[in-house]
Design a protein with these regions (language model features):
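Acidic/His-rich structured neighborhood in mature extracellular/periplasmic domains
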Residues: 125-176
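Positively charged n-region of N-terminal signal peptides that target proteins for export
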Residues: 1-4
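C-terminal motif of bacterial Sec signal peptides marking the signal peptidase cleavage site
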Residues: 13-14
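Catalytic cores and adjacent binding grooves of peptidoglycan-active enzymes
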Residues: 23-30, 154-260
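N-terminal low-complexity, Pro/Thr/Ser-rich intrinsically disordered segments
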Residues: 22-68
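Envelope-exposed proteins and targeting segments
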Residues: 114-116, 139-143, 249-253
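Extended, low-complexity, intrinsically disordered C-terminal regulatory tails
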Residues: 101-132, 210-240
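Active-site acidic/histidine clusters and adjacent loop/turn architecture
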Residues: 50-120, 186-202, 207-208, 212
Length: 260
């Protein structure tokens, strides 16, 4: 910048009354601004994504395969993929139609919850199969969603940048995170997110087959205004889970999508 100002001054006086060369110089400087470097996740996306493919999911969510997978984008206007480490290890591949469902739902949420950034968590490997330590996620139709959070009535993202370790966060049965100074689950935003996902699934010819959220948190979810609407839809929420599976679904909710 220290050298640009003197150069512009010389050009200005050299141009005299003819302003056109000066305007061209300014426009050239404006258009030649250096773009910020792409993130590692964006570079990975650019290299591996194949949006034109139509995916085929075979088998079950716990014993399945995925062909022609597409890669979920690392970020958008109101969402991010939660972990660079997970993304670069190829754990964000998805069935192409499920990707459409997610993007349609997130687009609608821009208007429904305009002040909320959502976090997409792990999905599947490029060819499906085991995604350790998950018991499912094997055919690109299972998706984990980070639970939206709040503190003192306001949106809070203080725990959202933990990456993979977010899976190890714990809440009490009222949705308050341990050692967080009062950060808690935003159940209203959670319900709105699931409603949007359900609507997008239906419009794309799919449905939500199952939602997994810690059972002790369901009452607080269904008490919210949007939670009451969610309960009326009779979407299946798992009510019988092993202790281990139940306990690990307090920082996120899991959805299995199924084509109608």
């Amino acid at each position: 910048m220290r050298y640009i100002i003197p150069v512009l001054s010389i050009l200005f006086f050299a141009c005299g009354e003819n302003k056109e060369p000066m305007i061209e110089v300014l426009q050239s400087i404006e258009t030649s601004k250096i773009e910020p470097p792409k993130s590692l996740m964006q570079l990975y996306y650019d290299k591996h994504n194949q949006d034109s493919l139509y995916s085929i999911s075979k088998g079950t969510v716990s014993n399945g395969k995925l062909s022609n997978a597409v890669l979920f984008p690392p970020k958008g206007n109101n969402y991010n993929y939660f972990s660079e480490q997970s993304y670069l290890k190829g754990r964000a591949f998805v069935n192409s139609e499920v990707k459409d469902i997610l993007l349609d739902a997130l687009a609608s949420l821009e208007n429904i919850v305009p002040n909320q950034q959502f976090q997409i968590m792990e999905i599947a490997h490029e060819h499906g199969g085991e995604l350790w330590p998950h018991r499912t996620h094997q055919k690109g139709t299972s998706v984990d969603f980070m639970l939206p959070k709040m503190k003192e009535g306001k949106v809070d993202y203080s725990l959202d940048q933990k990456g993979i370790s977010h899976y190890f966060l714990n809440t009490n049965n009222n949705g308050v995170y341990d050692d967080s100074d009062g950060v808690k689950i935003n159940f209203e935003s959670t319900a709105k997110e699931i409603l949007a996902l359900n609507k997008a699934a239906i419009l794309n010819g799919w449905k939500i087959k199952k939602v997994i959220l810690k059972i002790e948190l369901l009452d607080d979810l269904f008490k919210t205004p949007s939670g009451k609407k969610l309960k009326q839809l009779k979407i299946y929420f798992a009510k019988s889970l092993t202790k281990k599976v139940n306990e690990v679904h307090d920082d996120h909710f899991h959805i299995d999508f199924e084509k109608k």
